[in-house]
């Protein structure tokens, strides 16, 4: 049976984690691209050794883990090095993602992918759910959460697709500019919809 996949995406500071955790509280399994990206560069991993071999020991924190800030700074202004890093990590992330998607045992799985549209991955999902907020709210939330400057947030936003492009790819949208309980209600409604869609897809699988 093919796993029914709902892809959750949204710009930085939109509240993807809040929405994902609300689905998880309803028993929906999560496959989180950011978590997988951290797992493939754990201490002693082949990928981390390759990064240190290429960029030097300054890429390591005191505890032996990857210093993400140092790596970001190293590749930010060097497209060739960024291409090398993506070539190393993307196949590992993709393999781990596919394994987790296939092994999920539930009517549907929530696949959390911040750069879903940017990497043109939306075709892998049965349904695309976008968490949406206005730009100023994104900036304010990210500054508050990460302790970064407005300029840094705007640079990140510039590397992401536009709000309009993301919304154009959405099957469903959660407006995360309101009260937390509004998110809970909206997720509960979508959960029932996805259960019905997954059940329908399963019936079609069996009849074909």
Swiss-Prot record:
Enzyme Commission number(s) from the entry: 2.7.1.24
PROSITE patterns found in the cross-reference section: DPCK (PS51219)
Catalytic activity: 3'-dephospho-CoA + ATP = ADP + CoA + H(+)
One Gene Ontology MF term: ATP binding
Entry keyword set: ATP-binding, Coenzyme A biosynthesis, Cytoplasm, Kinase, Nucleotide-binding, Transferase
Residues where ATP binds: 13-18
GO cellular component: cytoplasm
First-tier enzyme category under EC: transferase
GO biological process, one term: coenzyme A biosynthetic process
Ranges for domain DPCK: 5-201
Pathway(s) this gene product operates in, as recorded in its UniProt entry: Cofactor biosynthesis; coenzyme A biosynthesis; CoA from (R)-pantothenate: step 5/5
Family listed: Belongs to the CoaE family.
Protein name per Swiss-Prot or TrEMBL: Dephospho-CoA kinase
Organismal lineage: Bacteria, Pseudomonadati, Pseudomonadota, Gammaproteobacteria, Enterobacterales
């Amino acid at each position: 049976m093919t796993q029914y996949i709902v892809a959750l995406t949204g710009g930085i500071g939109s509240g993807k984690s809040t929405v994902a955790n609300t689905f998880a509280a309803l028993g929906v399994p999560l496959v989180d691209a950011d978590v997988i990206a951290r797992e493939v560069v754990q201490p002693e991993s082949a990928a981390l050794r390759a990064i240190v071999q290429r960029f030097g020991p300054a890429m390591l924190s005191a505890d032996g883990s990857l210093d993400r800030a140092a790596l970001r700074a190293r590749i930010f202004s060097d497209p060739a090095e960024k291409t090398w890093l993506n070539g190393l990590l993307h196949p590992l992330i993709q393999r781990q993602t596919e394994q987790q998607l296939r092994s999920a045992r539930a009517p549907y799985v929530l696949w959390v992918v911040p750069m879903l549209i940017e990497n043109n991955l939306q075709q892998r999902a049965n349904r695309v759910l976008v968490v949406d907020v206005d730009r100023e709210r994104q900036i304010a939330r990210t500054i508050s959460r990460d302790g970064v400057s407005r300029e840094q947030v705007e640079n990140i936003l510039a590397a992401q697709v536009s709000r309009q492009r993301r919304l154009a790819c959405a099957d469903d949208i959660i407006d995360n500019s309101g009260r937390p309980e509004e998110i809970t209600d909206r997720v509960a409604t979508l959960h029932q919809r996805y259960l019905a869609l997954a059940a329908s897809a399963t019936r079609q699988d069996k009849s074909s």
